[in-house]
């Protein structure tokens, strides 16, 4: 074989590549009839996962069935390994709006003990409040506005709000940090 790259390095190189990338690319059930090569190629091109965070799986069908605006949900949620399980609860969903609570109990109504955060979107109209707060940059040259939390007897959500294609999106975390909110916003995907 007339090659400048010795064949003895190919096997370790391929093994290293598979170990580094294979477990993070996809998790596909062959019974679904999904072409794995197409999914891998699309994910490599997009540079992010096409699946939303598993916490949203129980509510996806309700959101998709009701709302007509583009659904954007984060793949990244900054929750510690020792935290209790996180649940998503649809608070409101109409054709032009959705509001999702993130809580530590399946029946959390955003209460102080069980609330973790919130995600919302609404079609921009003349009644939609303009985003307020400190201007920050997201990926793809999107501008967002950070509104810090306030504490009294309890702490409120810190919020990050941006507009995209006529829809205003907000992600909030109870006493959340700007860096966590930016990571969440930069990880949003539209569920497939």
Predicted features, each with a name:
Residues 6-9, 25, 33:
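Generic short N-terminal amphipathic or hydrophobic helices
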Residues 2-14:
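Bacterial N-terminal signal peptides that target proteins for export
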Residues 20-29:
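C-terminal segment of classical bacterial N-terminal signal peptides
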Residues 35-164:
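Short, solvent-exposed recognition patches
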């Amino acid at each position: 074989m007339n090659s400048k790259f010795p064949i003895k390095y190919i096997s370790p190189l391929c093994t290293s590549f598979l170990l580094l990338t294979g477990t993070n690319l996809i998790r596909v059930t062959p019974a679904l009839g999904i072409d794995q090569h197409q999914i891998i190629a699309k994910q490599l091109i997009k540079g992010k996962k096409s699946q939303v965070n598993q916490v949203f799986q129980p509510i996806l069908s309700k959101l998709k069935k009701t709302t007509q605006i583009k659904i954007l949900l984060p793949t990244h949620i900054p929750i510690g390994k020792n935290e209790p399980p996180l649940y998503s609860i649809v608070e409101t969903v109409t054709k032009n709006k959705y509001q999702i609570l993130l809580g530590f109990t399946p029946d959390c109504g955003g209460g102080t003990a069980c609330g973790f955060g919130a995600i919302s979107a609404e079609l921009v109209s003349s009644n939609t409040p303009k985003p307020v707060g400190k201007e920050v940059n997201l990926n793809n040259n999107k501008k967002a506005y950070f509104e810090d939390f306030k504490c009294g007897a309890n702490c409120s959500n810190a919020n990050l709000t941006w507009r995209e294609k006529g829809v205003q999106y907000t992600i909030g975390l109870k006493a959340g940090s700007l860096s966590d909110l930016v990571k969440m916003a930069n990880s949003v995907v539209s569920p497939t």
